[in-house]
Amino acid sequence: VAVTQQLVRVPDAQLAACRRSVEELDRLCSFELTPRADHLDLDWAPAPLLRACELASGSEYLVALRRSLDGDAEVNPAYRHYAGAIWEHPVSALEGPAVLHVAGTLRGLVPDTVLASLPIDGWEALGQSTGAMADPRGYVARHFAALLDFYEEAARRRLAVVMWWD
């Protein structure tokens, strides 16, 4: 079974409920509490996205991108001991105000600039295996655009973002 990064947009009240209850957090991580449109499956893209940003841009953008993928705080530490949880990757979140800040910062990051920093054999530059694709730029571009759009919508709707590996 593949382990990929998942993000979901939630209202602050839903995040608060998940902080109080591991059962509620499990329902969220089981895709039962929010519409499909509020989910983003980032596949294995976080590491290549971070490395591409590191190669192309300043630390302000790298910090914002890292926060967008890692969150600021674990949602509910008790969830690590819940049946079926992936304890090596705790569920974390960004509160609504942090989402606004991260989305605003990422808005200044130009995807074409990030992609231009990648050589043709970019998988090695990204510290990743080549897998089935020789050129990683399309993969990075798709996931980068999806992440930026996801955060723009979360900021517009004043939602928090919860992230985990599943």
Question: Where do the model's predicted regions map?
Answer:
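A structural signal for short, well-ordered beta-strand segments and their strand-loop junctions
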Residues: 160-165
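Acidic (Asp/Glu-rich) sequence patches and key acidic residues
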Residues: 1-149, 153
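Short, well-ordered loop/turn elements at secondary-structure boundaries
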Residues: 155-159
